[in-house]
Amino acid sequence: QCQETMEKLWVAIAERYRDCVTVAAYDIMNEPQNNGGYEGENSYDPWNSESWHMSNQIYDRMIKAIREVDRDHIITVEGIWRISNLPDPEKAGWDNMMYQLHLYDGDDMFRKLAAGLAETAQRYNVAAYVGEFQNMHGLGICNEYGISWTTWTYKGANQDVADFFC
């Protein structure tokens, strides 16, 4: 039932904005494999292939529904912290896609993951986007790899994520 409601919502959004040139992309789900620390009865391991498969099934359903009414807008899907959990869009039948990560890592891991995102984007012929980050060197690293980016917040530029909540 939740997926049905979600699909109806995305179809309504796509119908409303399909001709709107100021809408850059549709971001289907924010951090779909993130339990947010929840470890209760219905939690799952965000690092295993089963959770990736579940997310990709939902992505597939939403992308197909959106494409029924809007063939033009970019659709972005998030691998969140790792890009390897997203499928080859051509094999999935997806087009006009942007693959996205959210990176809250230190410089070395940020660089490694950004390099992987850039390589995946080139291999799959998709746009690359870091939709959230707080690393003070992240902007430069994204630019180095030709990755589009948005910082998580404009409140600060310190390494400690706690500084962003001030």
Language model features with spans:
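Extracellular glycoside hydrolase catalytic/binding regions
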Residues: 4-25, 29-152, 156, 161-166
